[in-house]
Swiss-Prot record:
Recorded family membership: Belongs to the SecB family.
Subunit text: Homotetramer, a dimer of dimers. One homotetramer interacts with 1 SecA dimer.
GO BP annotation list: protein folding; protein tetramerization; protein transport
Assigned GO CC terms: cytoplasm
Subcellular localization: Cytoplasm
Gene from which this protein is expressed: secB
Predominant subcellular localization, coarse grouping: cytoplasm
Keywords associated with the record: Chaperone, Cytoplasm, Protein transport, Translocation, Transport
Pfam families cross-referenced by the UniProt entry: SecB
Species in which this protein is naturally found: Rhizobium etli (strain ATCC 51251 / DSM 11541 / JCM 21823 / NBRC 15573 / CFN 42)
Protein name per Swiss-Prot or TrEMBL: Protein-export protein SecB
Keyword Repeat listed: no
Length: 160
């Protein structure tokens, strides 16, 4: 039987997914059926990603991955899709300084393949080739978020 304690008596860190869910999904194809006709060049696709986490208890957290993709041909929207995909995670035994990286890097990394598949399916079902979103560097996203928050804190700390 596996021992849940290491040699100094501390609990080994555990991260598990208790549930995954689609909170919100929308797909707009405002130019249909004209937008489905062959075109000379591929539309420009802009993808925005956001991650949020909220505590549900001392060990359970709701982590939400938001993906927003818009395809444009010039100034005309070809399609627009939004997905808010969440997971309830049990996070236990991690040192406090590791909690934010676990919630904002590891949890969305686990959710991403499922969210990516939903976006691919909905764009395909909308009459377009499946939109296969490239892997996301959640470590870089988290580092950028921390840097932005530190910069905001510095600006607020400067007296007028």
């Amino acid at each position: 039987m596996a021992d849940d304690n290491n040699s100094n008596g501390a609990t080994n860190p555990t991260l598990s997914i208790l549930a995954q869910y689609t909170k919100d999904l929308s797909f707009e194809n405002p130019g249909a059926p004209r937008s489905l006709q062959a075109r000379d060049k591929a539309p420009t696709i802009n993808i925005n990603v956001n991650v949020n986490a909220n505590p549900l208890s001392d060990t359970d957290f709701d982590v939400v991955l938001s993906l927003n993709a818009e395809a444009k041909d010039g100034d005309k929207t070809v399609f627009h899709t939004e997905l808010v995909y969440g997971g309830v995670f049990r996070v236990a035994g991690f040192p406090q300084e590791h909690m934010l990286p676990v919630l904002f890097i590891e949890c969305p990394r686990m959710l991403f393949p499922f969210a990516r598949q939903i976006i691919a399916d909905v764009t395909r079902n909308g009459g377009f080739p499946p939109l296969m979103i490239d892997p996301i560097d959640f470590t870089q996203m988290f580092a950028q978020r921390v840097a932005e928050e530190q910069a905001r804190a510095k600006v607020q700390a400067v007296p007028n």
